[in-house]
A protein has these predicted regions:
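Beta/alpha (TIM)-barrel catalytic core signal, keyed to glycine-rich beta->alpha loops juxtaposed to Asp/Glu
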Residues: 114-302, 309
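Active-site groove signature of glycoside hydrolases
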Residues: 99-118
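Structural motif
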Residues: 38, 42, 100-101, 133, ...
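Residues at the N-termini of beta-strands
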Residues: 15, 46, 105-108, 137, ...
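N-terminal binding-site loop/beta-alpha segment at the start of enzyme catalytic domains
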Residues: 1-74, 131
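Active-site mouth loops of central-metabolism enzymes
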Residues: 19-30, 80-88, 112, 117
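Short, acidic/polar
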Residues: 27-39, 86-100, 148-153
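A short, structured active-site edge motif that brings together acidic residues
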Residues: 73-84, 108-112, 167-169
């Protein structure tokens, strides 16, 4: 396993993080705990979850794992909240998340954008929790550059805690983060972790333009993913990547994961899992990287996606 130095915590954290969105939704509690165990055995020390994943079951499973293994101190927890970000809701959610996960603190706690709540209120609440030690660093999810800058002004004026982490989508199809987020976060010492390296499975090539989604796949379970990825420009990009896959004898998964994992500006790449192979694959890629020539070809094929607005 390769490890990144997270500037915001001054801590070595695995380049691959375990996304826990499937826990309690697509896989059982026992299966989830087994995957957490395998992840730790293979050097992964970051778990990413949310107050709302599987109506709280995801966090509860993580808490049960900590209770069994007694290894909370070895793991970095990233959790978050979306939707209603009123003071009352944030306070309730953080307190409940701490109880669910059997912990006295959350390493990174992320907030999204709530158009119905004043940003000052959101930043004040999470800052207070950081100062109390219940959050080590405040994080944000899917913020664009204008939201980051607006937040910074409020944080500086009010002496609120600044963001230490940005969680954002990033893959061969959605490359918008490269336009301005990367440089800004580097200057502000904000670590970046990315999610959806395979586009919720779209980048595996299993979905075809005009065809019905295969049963029990992510797009069948959660049809809203179609609004994000079923675009003509993405199907065209996938056709080009499939040609490269055939030419190089590397699968689409190998190509997509290798490219994302090679991006130095990402402190961590989150991998959603349903079985052990989903953990082993990115680790194997880190240990046996694809050569620069092929990575550059992927870069060239997908460069037009820099101008696309992230979902």
């Amino acid at each position: 396993m390769l490890y990144s130095n997270f500037k915001s915590l001054n801590k070595k954290i695995s380049k691959v993080g375990l996304g826990c969105v499937t826990f309690g939704r697509e896989i059982t509690e026992d299966e989830s705990i087994r995957l957490l165990d395998v992840a730790v055995e293979n050097g992964i020390n970051l778990f990413n979850t949310s107050y709302y994943y599987s109506d709280g079951i995801s966090e509860k499973i993580i808490g049960k794992f900590f209770k069994i293994k007694k290894n909370r101190k070895d793991i970095t927890i990233v959790s978050k909240i979306h939707g209603d970000l009123s003071k009352k809701t944030i306070e309730k959610c953080i307190h409940e998340s701490l109880i669910r996960m059997n912990t006295d603190h959350i390493d990174y706690y992320g907030v999204t954008h709530d158009p119905n709540t004043n940003l000052d209120e959101v930043l004040e609440v999470v800052s207070r929790f950081q100062k109390e030690g219940k959050i080590l660093r405040v994080a944000c999810n899917n913020y664009d550059i204008s939201m980051l800058k607006s937040s910074k002004k409020i944080q500086e004026i009010n002496n609120f805690s600044k963001f230490g982490l940005l969680e954002t989508v990033y893959n061969v199809l959605y490359r918008g983060a490269e336009k301005d987020l990367i440089n800004y976060c580097d200057l502000e010492n904000i670590d970046i972790i990315s999610y959806s390296p395979l586009g919720a499975g779209f980048i595996t090539g299993k979905y075809k333009n005009g065809k019905v989604s295969p049963k029990k796949t992510r797009f069948d379970i959660k049809p809203s993913h179609k609004d994000i990825y079923f675009k003509d420009v993405f199907f065209e990009t996938m056709n080009k990547l499939e040609n490269l896959s055939n030419e190089t004898n590397f699968s689409l998964i190998d190509l997509a994961l290798s490219w994302v994992l090679s991006r130095d500006f990402l402190s961590n790449v989150l991998i959603g899992v349903r079985d052990i192979s989903h953990i082993k694959k990115p680790i194997n890629i880190l240990e046996n990287p694809i050569n620069e020539i092929i990575l550059n070809e992927i870069n060239e094929i997908t460069k037009n996606n820099l101008d696309l607005i992230d979902p």
